[in-house]
Regions:
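Conserved aromatic
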Residues: 10, 30, 73-76, 120
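Hydrophobic/aromatic-rich core segments of domains that either
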Residues: 128-181
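Active-site nucleophilic cysteine motif
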Residues: 82-86, 90, 122-137
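A glycine-rich, coil/turn loop motif that links secondary-structure elements
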Residues: 104-108, 119, 123, 154-159
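Generic, ordered loop/turn and secondary-structure boundary motif
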Residues: 2, 37, 97, 119-120
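Extracellular adhesion/carbohydrate-binding repeat motifs centered on closely spaced tryptophans
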Residues: 1-63, 150, 155-171
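Secondary-structure boundary elements
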Residues: 58-118
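Aromatic side chains
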Residues: 8-9, 28, 87-89, 96-98, ...
């Protein structure tokens, strides 16, 4: 629906969509008044002059997260219950498997790319698990932090007995979903 120069998408009851929403394979966003977001970037997702998101890894990740989280949670769950549902989903060997993938840490947005790749392929290493859990946590309202460090291990073959590893911190708590595999 267009009112003057402002575009809206409305449901069958005439209510404008607010927040991120999907129509077909496209991602849109309505502001608090339901006005379609255009020529703007919100939460790393860039919207064009027609009001739908560019088809880049940020929009694809957002869509994947919306799909998965809507399947594994419900609106009656608390934020912490949703986080636990995300944890259970990600650490279930029936949903994901361990596979080696070394991201380009110098590439801007590598965390989102790694999370997207893991969600669509089903496989990842510690960085994939950490980035995916962080992306899921962010989607439900947390402010996660992906940590890159070194822990005891021999995977890297380093003489000091340490190996590179990635994990997540959320509200001061440490989460290591890859450690479940």
């Amino acid at each position: 629906v267009k009112v003057g120069k402002t575009s809206y998408y409305v449901d069958t009851k005439g209510h404008a969509y607010v927040g991120f929403f999907k129509l077909g394979n496209r991602l849109y966003r309505g502001d608090v008044k339901g006005r379609l977001t255009k020529n703007k970037t919100v939460s790393n997702v860039t919207f064009n002059s027609k009001g739908y998101a560019d088809n880049d890894v940020n929009a694809k990740l957002k869509i994947e997260l919306m799909n998965v989280i809507s399947r594994i949670t419900n609106p009656g769950m608390s934020k912490s219950q949703k986080l636990y549902a995300c944890w259970c989903y990600l650490t279930s060997s029936s949903n994901f498997y361990y596979s080696g993938y070394w991201p380009d840490f110098n590439k801007k947005g590598w965390q989102r790319e790694v999370a997207y790749n893991m969600l669509v392929s089903g496989g990842g290493d510690c960085y994939g698990f950490a980035c995916t859990f962080a992306a899921m946590a962010r989607e439900i309202g947390y402010n996660p932090y992906v940590v890159l460090g070194r822990v005891s291990g021999t995977r890297d073959g380093a003489a000091d007995g340490l190996t590179s590893h990635g994990w997540v911190i959320i509200d001061g708590c440490y989460y290591d979903p890859e450690a479940q595999f």
